[in-house]
Amino acid sequence: MNNQDLINDKSKNGLTYAKAGVNIDMGNAMVEKIKPFIRATKRAGTDAEIGGFGGLFDLKAAGFTDPILVAANDGVGTKLKIAIEVGIHDTIGIDLVAMCVNDLLVQGAEPLFFLDYFATGKLDPEQGAAIVSGIAKGCQQAGAALIGGETAEMPDMYAKGDYDLAGFAVGAAERSALLPSKDLTEGDIILGLSSSGIHSNGFSLVRRIIQQSDLKWNDHAPFNPQMNLGTALLTPTRIYVKSLLPIIKSYKGIKALAHITGGGFLENIPRVLPSSLCAEINLSAIHVPSIFSWIAKQGKIEKIEMLRTFNCGVGMIIIVAQHEVEKVTQELKMQGETVTLLGKLTKRQNKGITFKGALHL
């Protein structure tokens, strides 16, 4: 039997993979749609072409001499549910990339490449292409190449229209430039970089508040009447790589970073500190965006719970030696970041973080 015979040998009554719910042709159609997005992420070290069994990256071509590889993977939690219900799919991929590459940045690493996992019950090529376009935008913002991924069509695993996303990022740092630095000391200054909003944590709580308030996704956002609620909540997570990475490389006084994600201030800042030091944060210095004030008021959420769940307007923490604070602050502002002096490192007594002042919600 030759190839043509195989193609023509179709039993009208026989089962096929497509009849079982997996349409390979739809998957191939989606691949063709996303190729231009992926090519746009090309960078030194890779051609950002897909189709092979694995993606390749040349560390030497990327300019590293003694690199340490750094890996991170993450998802976007139940922010996905809002994207699905609102029908906006071209920004959630930015969140996916942000959650991974911002974690790489905390180690002092430059994001090199990214891979995604997209799973759904029934593949919609248009929806899938929109999602990947967002992932590609995030990769461009981070300077990372999108070198591969997996699209899984799994009948009966997901409700109609639902999907899930996961991302995996790899970066590199020169061995001598890894963060956090070992010379963190009392008196080092804590700076905060503003977030773009909720980012990608705490959405199960946000969704519960919205359910109790009877608001609809197309209603005006109570905290931002110029936008509808769904669009406002889907504001993408800020990616700090291009503004912060050159400064990390230029100033040895930058000793540590902390990405304020799940666990908020309470969990994430102590993670980068030695057991002898404590972060003293002045809550009065934080400019809390109206979205968090609305969440706290609507849900009757205590301030400590807000600080443990949300970024409260601060998406990235930087710990800097006193003598370089002014220069680092100026550089960050020139890169378009909003910088706040939040506190300093002190000798640890019991906890890895203490607060003074009041959080103005």
Curated annotation (Swiss-Prot):
Its main location: cytoplasm. Disulfide bonds: none annotated. Keywords: ATP-binding, Cytoplasm, Ligase, Nucleotide-binding, Purine biosynthesis. Belongs to the AIR synthase family. It catalyses: 2-formamido-N(1)-(5-O-phospho-beta-D-ribosyl)acetamidine + ATP = 5-amino-1-(5-phospho-beta-D-ribosyl)imidazole + ADP + phosphate + H(+). GO terms for biological process: 'de novo' IMP biosynthetic process; adenine biosynthetic process. Its EC number is 6.3.3.1. InterPro entries: PurM-like_C_dom (IPR010918), PurM-like_C_sf (IPR036676), PurM-like_N (IPR016188), PurM-like_N_sf (IPR036921), PurM_cligase (IPR004733). GO terms for cellular component: cytosol. The gene is purM. Transmembrane segments: none annotated. It comes from the Bacteria. Pathway: Purine metabolism; IMP biosynthesis via de novo pathway; 5-amino-1-(5-phospho-D-ribosyl)imidazole from N(2)-formyl-N(1)-(5-phospho-D-ribosyl)glycinamide: step 2/2. SUPFAM superfamilies: PurM C-terminal domain-like, PurM N-terminal domain-like. It is found in: Cytoplasm. This is Phosphoribosylformylglycinamidine cyclo-ligase. GO terms for molecular function: ATP binding; phosphoribosylamine-glycine ligase activity; phosphoribosylformylglycinamidine cyclo-ligase activity.
